[in-house]
């Protein structure tokens, strides 16, 4: 008889045989509402949920704020002599009396809480937070969503390492800048902004400790329309190793002191509604400054929208050199592929290239310069071309270009929308007819998976 069979017949409860501290750790990984339901299992489990140092609660699950406060106070009272690890509170209903909730949040913060998340799901429900939040010596991470942040007399968050500020309102222009600068060991910052009259148009991020920065503005989700040139982003973070910019509103991006090992994910449009706006020197100047600020990057992922603007910029201005760049993942509109050699020429040490092709050629065929970029002759080892839609052969012309001109190429991969195995086989056979500059190159064709 197997041991498992014996256990099943004896009805042994392995979970309940664990010590309390392990059970508490298991319960802390559940939403509090689920953890509380375990109290009906037995006398031992009745109050076990109160020993979990995490409160993850949705106020909407309670009949009213008074019921919630009664429940939450009971929970906090169980931590009078110990630290609360995490408080995650969310709500949506407008009936919530925040002036009842705020003192309770203050009480929780005084228990030397390490992680705090306040998530309002209706517009700017929380008009203020207790001052203890901004003076906490214990907070390690802070996430605020739809919160009104007023002018701070004093802010000090000496141990805060992670901060996510999402769709909040800042009553004064310097509020966010002061907030960020008051976190001397901040490593991870996310800022999601709205496009409205209340949002400060110039965002300045200055930090000597920041490692990861994500900035987001999506004007398509906002009712307010502002085509002014006042929206700007200024970044000075010399320790930054990851930068994500998803911004279709800001006109200008000034990036200072980016380190040589940094990686970036870029999707910006400089608030350009018409590509011909780049005929103006002011618009081109903003693009040029942005590219110069990114020129020390090691690894970049760039959107088709941003690359289209850069390609038009290159018809008028030279591209700065990205000498540290070893990996580039780019979405390229096929109508802009004639500028690809120019982009590659600016990356003389590129080792890995991923191109995802978008759009269709209308009447003309793609024309690539006969001049071979330096990286193809000396450093480019891996190339992947992705063609999600069945095109008119641009991916094959591009494949031929790389196979015939890349001297040290080791791996070439074509990911294409093939309707059948037979069509996939035809693509392989055509690729094998192309002359290969690198005899060591391995060719791989895979079907694009939707």
UniProtKB/Swiss-Prot annotation:
The protein's UniProt keywords, in alphabetical order, are: Leucine-rich repeat, Repeat
Q: Where are the LRR repeats?
A: 157-181, 294-317
Domain FBD intervals:
364-416
InterPro entries cross-referenced by the UniProt entry: F-box-like_dom_sf, F-box_AtFBL13-like, F-box_dom, FBD, FBL13/AtMIF1-like, LRR_dom_sf, LRR_FXL15/At3g58940/PEG3-like
What domain of life does the native source organism fall in? Answer: Eukaryota
Q: Where is the signal peptide?
A: none
Q: Which Gene3D superfamilies match?
A: 1.20.1280.50, Ribonuclease Inhibitor
Look up keyword Repeat and say if it applies. Answer: yes
User: F-box domain location, by residue?
Assistant: 12-58
**Protein name in the entry:** F-box/FBD/LRR-repeat protein At5g22660
Question: Which organism does this record belong to?
Answer: Arabidopsis thaliana
Source taxonomy: Eukaryota, Viridiplantae, Streptophyta, Embryophyta, Tracheophyta
């Amino acid at each position: 008889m197997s041991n498992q069979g014996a256990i099943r017949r004896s009805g042994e409860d392995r979970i309940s045989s664990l010590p309390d501290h392990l059970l508490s750790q298991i319960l802390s990984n559940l939403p509090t509402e689920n953890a509380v339901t375990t109290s009906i299992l037995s006398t031992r489990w009745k109050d076990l949920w109160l020993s979990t140092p995490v409160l993850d609660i949705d106020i909407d699950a309670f009949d009213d704020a008074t019921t919630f406060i009664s429940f939450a106070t009971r929970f906090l009272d169980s931590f009078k002599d110990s630290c609360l690890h995490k408080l995650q509170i969310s709500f949506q209903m407008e009936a919530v009396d925040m002036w009842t909730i705020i003192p309770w949040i203050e009480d929780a913060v005084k228990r030397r809480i390490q992680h705090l998340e306040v998530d309002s799901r209706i517009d700017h429900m929380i008009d203020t937070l207790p001052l203890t939040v901004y003076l906490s010596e214990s907070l390690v991470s802070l996430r605020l969503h739809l919160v009104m942040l007023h002018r701070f007399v004093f802010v000090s968050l000496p141990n805060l390492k992670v901060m996510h500020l999402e769709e909040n309102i800042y009553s004064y222009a310097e509020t966010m800048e002061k907030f960020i600068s008051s976190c001397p060991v901040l490593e991870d910052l996310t800022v999601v902004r709205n496009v409205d009259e209340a949002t400060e148009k110039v965002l300045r991020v200055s930090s000597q400790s920041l490692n990861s920065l994500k900035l987001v503005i999506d004007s398509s989700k906002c009712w307010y329309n502002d085509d002014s040139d006042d929206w700007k982003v200024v970044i000075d973070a010399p320790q930054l190793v990851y930068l994500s910019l998803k911004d279709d509103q800001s006109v200008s991006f000034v990036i200072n002191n980016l380190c040589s090992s940094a990686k970036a994910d870029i999707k910006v449009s400089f608030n350009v509604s018409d590509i011909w706006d780049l005929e103006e020197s002011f618009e081109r100047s903003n693009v040029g400054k942005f590219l110069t600020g990114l020129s020390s990057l090691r690894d970049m992922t760039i959107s088709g929208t941003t690359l289209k603007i850069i390609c038009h910029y290159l018809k008028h201005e030279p591209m700065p050199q990205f000498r540290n760049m070893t990996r580039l993942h780019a979405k390229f509109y096929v109508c802009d592929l004639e500028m690809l050699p120019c982009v590659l020429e600016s990356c003389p040490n590129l080792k890995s290239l991923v191109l995802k092709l978008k759009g269709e050629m209308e009447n003309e065929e793609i024309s690539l310069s006969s001049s071979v970029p330096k990286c193809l002759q000396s450093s480019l080892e891996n190339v992947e071309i992705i063609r999600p839609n069945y095109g008119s052969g641009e991916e094959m012309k591009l494949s031929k270009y790389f196979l015939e001109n890349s001297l040290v190429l080791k791996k070439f991969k074509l990911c294409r929308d093939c309707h059948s195995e037979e069509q996939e086989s035809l693509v392989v056979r055509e690729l094998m007819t192309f002359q290969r500059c690198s005899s060591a190159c391995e060719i791989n064709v895979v079907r694009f998976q939707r």
